Design a protein with these regions (language model features):
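Short beta-strand-to-loop capping motifs
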Residues: 63, 192-194, 259-261
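Active-site beta-loop-alpha junctions enriched in small/polar residues
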Residues: 26, 78-80, 136, 166, ...
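Histidine/acidic-residue-rich, glycine-tolerant segments that coordinate divalent metal ions
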Residues: 60, 81-100, 106-107, 112, ...
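Acidic/His- and Gly-rich active-site-bordering loop/insert found
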Residues: 1-101, 106, 110-125
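Divalent metal-coordination and catalytic microenvironments
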Residues: 21, 61, 75, 105, ...
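Conserved acidic residues
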Residues: 48, 157-158, 344
Length: 387
């Protein structure tokens, strides 16, 4: 089954929805305008049930098929934007300063709406499709909020599927893998407390800058010497702040960064070693290191059987030559991981073509991907809910 003719027919309409959402970006849980737009469209499609306020501002639409099966699957799209100023020029560019859809969640929402429209028209499946529109993917754990609100139980969801666009991947292609596909994106901060002095009298100081520099160097040993080289981990220091002027050794310095891992054991190792290295180096130099470590999201782990189902649906749409079933994992993070911890499922990438990268002020979702995404969602739902 290639691209659905019906999906191709209303691609322009879905593109118009996408561009409308792009012009009205909202952040985290504050997606009231977007959620209202989604709810209105679902109502127009005549779906069976629309439930709002799940995970604060999330929406679930229920589409029942022709048969009597109680089986239900969930298809998820994220709705929130990013705190960026968009490079102007497009007629549908953001109308809200400091906010833009730089990760393609406008496209994700529009594609799932397109699939909902098609599924509500045809209902060529036996069971229930729950179309899930999630807030706060960008750092707000919106997926966890929806899970903790009892979404899976309320709608009887047995399997859950997600999709994300990928700049640099050709249009009309998909990519997926079994196991970890997205990393756990953790954060750490270190405060080094020493003793300040005049810069001309360094012997009277316990210099947090020199000590902090040693800590930064020591952290590189985690990936280079502590972790199994066959289990990927990234430890990146991204901020180092200290001092206010040129002739004073400050009393403290702050260091922060991120850890990315695809293995829970390596993740725990990195957390432990950051504390040991920072506290050990500081203590050896008569200073104190205070370490905070925040686990943001788990590793996004695709379940084997559901990954096979997702790949099969993609192959039916674009052909086997255009589906990479063993793509390299990404060290970016994704809170869909919480849904995959709650139910078996899979997360797939869809090609966005040669566009600016994600989280870039020049990025835009490629509307030419819409028909592929809508067709994938429809094919997946119909395959998983056959008699």
């Amino acid at each position: 089954m290639p691209i659905l003719n019906r999906a191709a027919e209303f691609q322009q309409e879905v593109s118009e929805w996408r561009r409308h959402l792009h012009a009205h970006p909202e952040l985290l849980y504050d997606v009231e305008y977007t959620a209202a737009f989604v709810a209105e469209k679902l109502k127009e499609f005549g779906i069976d049930e629309i439930v709002t306020g799940i995970g604060r501002t999330g929406i679930v639409g229920v589409i029942r098929g022709r048969g009597e099966s109680s089986r239900a699957i969930g298809l998820r799209a994220d709705m929130d934007a990013l705190p960026l100023d968009e490079i102007p020029g497009r007629p549908w560019a953001s109308t809200i300063p400091g906010k833009m859809h730089a990760c393609g969640h406008d496209g994700h929402t529009a594609m799932l709406l397109g699939a909902a429209k098609y599924l509500a028209e045809t209902r060529n499946f036996n069971g229930t499709v729950a179309v899930i529109f999630q807030p706060a993917e960008e750092g707000g754990r919106g997926a966890l909020a929806m899970v903790e609100d009892g979404m899976m139980e309320q709608f009887g969801i047995r399997e859950i599927y997600g999709m994300h666009n990928m700049p640099g991947m050709e249009l009309g292609t998909f990519a997926i893998r079994k196991g970890g596909i997205m990393a756990a994106p953790d954060k750490f901060s270190i405060t080094v407390r020493g003793r300040g002095s005049h810069a001309a009298e360094p012997h009277k100081a316990v210099d947090p800058i020199v000590i902090g520099a040693q800590i930064v160097g020591g952290l590189q040993l985690i990936a280079a010497r502590n972790a199994n080289p066959l289990r990927s981990v990234v430890v990146s220091v991204t901020q180092f702040h200290a001092g206010t002027t040129h002739n004073i050794i400050p009393e403290h310095a702050s260091i922060s960064g991120t850890v990315r891992s695809l293995d829970e054991g390596v993740r725990t190792l990195a957390e432990q070693r950051i504390a040991q290295i920072a506290e050990g180096i500081a203590g050896a130099n008569d200073a104190v290191a205070e370490v905070e470590y925040e686990r943001a999201c788990p590793v996004t782990v695709n379940h084997p059987e559901e990954t096979t189902h997702a790949a099969r649906a993609a192959i039916d749409v674009v052909g086997a030559a255009n589906v990479d079933t063993d793509v390299d994992a990404s060290m970016a993070g994704e809170d869909f991981a919480f849904m995959l911890q709650s139910r078996p499922g899979a997360y797939i990438m869809i090609g966005n073509g040669d566009t600016a990268g994600l989280h870039n002020p020049g990025y835009d979702f490629n509307d030419e991907a819409i028909a592929f995404g809508v067709s994938y969602w429809v094919r997946l739902a119909e395959q998983r809910l056959t008699d």
